């Protein structure tokens, strides 16, 4: 979408909606009444299909009891593998390389406990200072388990400007004492996409394994994890994937690592034909299924089935195309209408580097977010000064983007935000 061809009018926004090939998917979702939802990068909305598959699993439990493990609409015993196969195209992997299991942080613990093998002088883990805090907590914990001090053994690449990371800085930090690299695919504040293939290649040239947190990219951008040679990745399924609060997460392990014993063993990581032999000798699956630990949380897994059906129909390439058009249009309107109110666009403007959300910086960000909510817009605040706005390709309209900017303009003109305190709420 060429910004020179854009117009700041409501009529133009409606024209874009009429031309949108994905517009019919909006009817698949329950939209909060009297609201414009801009927080799908924190929690995606419920679709009617996700609701249906949840009720289906409940009905099977109701009617079949324990036989639901092998009978019913979606037999539970291998459901994690089947959902993994549905997730695989979204991360560019084979079905065997992906499994739906655990939570983001549990899966990170599992993968680091498997692939962090300190030996000789290779004892350190490389991360970055802008990543999501839970990843840092997990890495620090894993280092302590191995007897290392995180203050000396967890390297965090610094940002030059507090917004973005430079690949050259990350590569320069891949020293001979680094055993493992764990980075985000997309930075959760600024929405910057890192060059995953370049970083993977450079890590492997130095004999270092590398994994990625894909929480802010899964369902928003295409990936080619297998082709790029990424060793492992992990993500949540409740943001762009619309799997619901607490939805079971996902992980990917490159097939070259199949046969490696998982660091955290549990009975659902067994080969399926051995699991109920009840032997005390663990026989791990020869796929990513080996990295499961306990019994799957089926009621938190069920909505993902319906959600993934929508992704299969829409296609991640078309989703990405519309997402870029939405955020490009958003930035255009912000520059047209809000340039005199002190906002700074803190996300990359380049399509290749921009994820699925807009990151607006303002010294009154927390107050403005509260005022937006009062005006029916649901944004997201990240300390100290960031307003995140995520127009979601499957259910956000161009007219809604136009309306959000008009509401923000009115808030700033009338200084409506001044009646609120400039601090975050319990859940930002």
Curated annotation (Swiss-Prot):
GO function term, MF aspect, one: kynureninase activity
Protein name, entry field: Kynureninase
PANTHER family, per the entry: KYNURENINASE
Pathway: Amino-acid degradation; L-kynurenine degradation; L-alanine and anthranilate from L-kynurenine: step 1/1; Cofactor biosynthesis; NAD(+) biosynthesis; quinolinate from L-kynurenine: step 2/3
EC number: 3.7.1.3
Pfam family, any one: KYNU_C
Entry's family note: Belongs to the kynureninase family.
């Amino acid at each position: 979408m060429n910004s020179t061809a854009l117009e700041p009018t409501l009529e133009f926004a409606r024209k874009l909606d009429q031309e949108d090939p994905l517009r019919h998917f909006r009817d698949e979702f329950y939209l909060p009444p009297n609201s414009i939802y801009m927080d799908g990068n924190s929690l995606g909305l419920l679709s009617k299909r996700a609701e249906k598959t949840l009720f289906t699993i409940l009905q099977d439990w109701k009617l079949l009891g324990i036989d639901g493990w092998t009978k019913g609409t979606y037999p539970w015993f291998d459901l994690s593998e089947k959902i993994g196969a549905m997730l695989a195209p979204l991360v560019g992997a084979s079905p065997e390389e992906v499994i739906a299991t655990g939570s983001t942080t549990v899966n990170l613990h599992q993968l680091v406990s498997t692939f962090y093998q300190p030996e000789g002088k290779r004892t350190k883990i490389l991360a970055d200072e802008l990543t999501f805090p839970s990843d840092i907590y997990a890495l620090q914990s894993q280092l302590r388990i191995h007897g290392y001090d995180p203050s000396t053994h967890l390297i965090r690449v610094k940002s030059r400007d507090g917004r973005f990371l430079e690949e050259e800085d990350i590569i320069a930090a891949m020293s001979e004492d680094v055993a493992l690299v764990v980075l985000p695919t997309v930075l959760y504040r600024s929405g910057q996409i890192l060059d995953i293939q370049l970083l993977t290649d450079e890590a492997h040239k130095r004999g270092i394994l590398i994994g990625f947190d894909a929480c802010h990219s899964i369902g928003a951008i295409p990936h080619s994890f297998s082709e790029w040679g990424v060793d492992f990745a992990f993500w949540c399924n409740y943001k762009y994937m619309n799997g619901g609060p607490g939805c079971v997460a996902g992980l990917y392990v490159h097939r070259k690592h199949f046969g490696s014993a998982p660091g955290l063993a549990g009975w659902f990581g067994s080969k399926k034909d051995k699991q109920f032999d009840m032997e005390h000798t663990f026989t791990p699956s020869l796929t990513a299924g080996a990295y499961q630990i306990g019994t799957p949380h089926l009621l938190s897994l069920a909505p993902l089935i319906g959600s993934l059906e929508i992704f299969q129909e829409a296609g991640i390439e078309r989703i990405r195309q519309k997402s870029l058009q939405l955020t490009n249009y958003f930035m255009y309107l912000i520059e047209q209408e809000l340039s005199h109110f002190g906002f700074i666009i803190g996300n990359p403007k380049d399509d290749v580097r921009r994820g699925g959300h807009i990151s607006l910086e303002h010294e009154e960000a927390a107050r403005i977010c509260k005022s937006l909510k009062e005006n029916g817009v649901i944004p997201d605040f990240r300390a100290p000064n960031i307003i995140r706005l995520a127009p979601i390709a499957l259910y956000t309209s161009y007219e809604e983007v136009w309306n959000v900017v008009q509401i923000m303009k009115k808030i700033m003109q009338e200084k409506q935000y001044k009646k609120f305190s400039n601090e975050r709420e319990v859940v930002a």
